[in-house]
């Protein structure tokens, strides 16, 4: 860490990496992925190995305002070659993905939610680290809701309970890999489903665009809809912000019903 000097920090990390070290660069996601983007790109083109750790990623917390809400970080890091983007969803996954990141030959961006959140029952038991694979948290039929955010995963699981009252039983998938996808897994888990992607990032340049591109290259039948940010994020309490942007459990349920009902 170098305080609020992310460009210097990333440049120093590049120097350490040329000497054989594996630096872990840490800052708030909104600043880490934007201010030193040039230095991150240069490090990557020089084939140096660095792990970038971004905290406060996504829409929440809602209090600090949009300068601190990292809702374009995935887009900002998309043009970096040899970079894998991952969002761990639990303490267990943090350890697993940090070990993976150290062993991987590629640069890594670890996207962290660093506010308290709840996870579905038996989440860690259901979650296995396999490159490019998501984890099915709850089985369902015809409809699949996918996210990478632990906060949104909790909201989606609550939405599923509300949807069951309408005789709609969606599959729920947690997908920690943001730009690496296994084609065989996609075919096995998503073929012939209506996929609804929920993310705490702008629609443009986010996870949905990446997995949609991967799906478009396969000979499979998947309808895709996206629930994500479409305007500059508002500030307020966490619940107010989720409600406003349609990412609370009730709002997700309402949006899904509007997408699937004629």
Describe the residue ranges of each PLM region.
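Short alpha-helical basic/polar micro-motif
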Residues: 11, 75, 250
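Short pre-catalytic strand/loop immediately N-terminal to key active-site residues, enriched for Gly-Thr
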Residues: 1
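Glycine-rich oxoanion-binding loops at beta->alpha junctions
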Residues: 4-6, 10
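Thiamine diphosphate
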Residues: 61-64, 111-262
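Conserved thiamine diphosphate
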Residues: 5, 15-144, 153-154, 170
């Amino acid at each position: 860490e170098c305080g609020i000097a992310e460009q210097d920090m990333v440049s120093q990390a590049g120097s350490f990496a040329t000497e054989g070290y594996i630096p872990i660069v840490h800052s708030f996601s909104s600043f880490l992925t934007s201010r030193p983007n040039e230095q991150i790109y240069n490090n990557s083109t020089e084939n140096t190995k660095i792990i970038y750790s971004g905290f406060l990623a996504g829409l929440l917390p809602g209090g600090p305002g949009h300068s601190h809400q990292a809702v374009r970080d995935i887009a900002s890091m998309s043009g970096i070659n040899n970079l894998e983007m991952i969002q761990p969803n639990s303490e267990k996954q943090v350890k697993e993905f940090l070990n993976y990141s150290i062993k991987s030959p590629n640069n890594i961006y670890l996207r962290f939610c660093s506010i308290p959140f709840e996870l579905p029952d038996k989440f860690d038991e259901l979650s296995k680290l396999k490159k490019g694979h998501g984890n099915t948290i709850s089985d369902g039929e015809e409809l699949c809701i996918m996210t990478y955010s632990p906060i949104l995963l909790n909201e989606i699981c609550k939405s599923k309970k509300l949807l069951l009252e309408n005789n709609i039983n969606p599959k729920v998938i947690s997908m920690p890999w943001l730009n690496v996808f296994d084609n065989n897994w996609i075919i096995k888990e998503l073929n012939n489903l209506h996929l609804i992607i929920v993310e705490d990032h702008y629609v443009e340049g986010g996870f949905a665009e990446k997995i949609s591109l991967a799906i478009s290259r396969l000979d499979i039948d998947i309808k895709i809809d996206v629930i994500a940010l479409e305007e500059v994020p508002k500030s307020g309490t966490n619940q107010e912000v989720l409600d406003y942007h349609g990412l609370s459990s009730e709002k997700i349920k309402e949006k899904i019903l509007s997408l699937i009902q004629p």
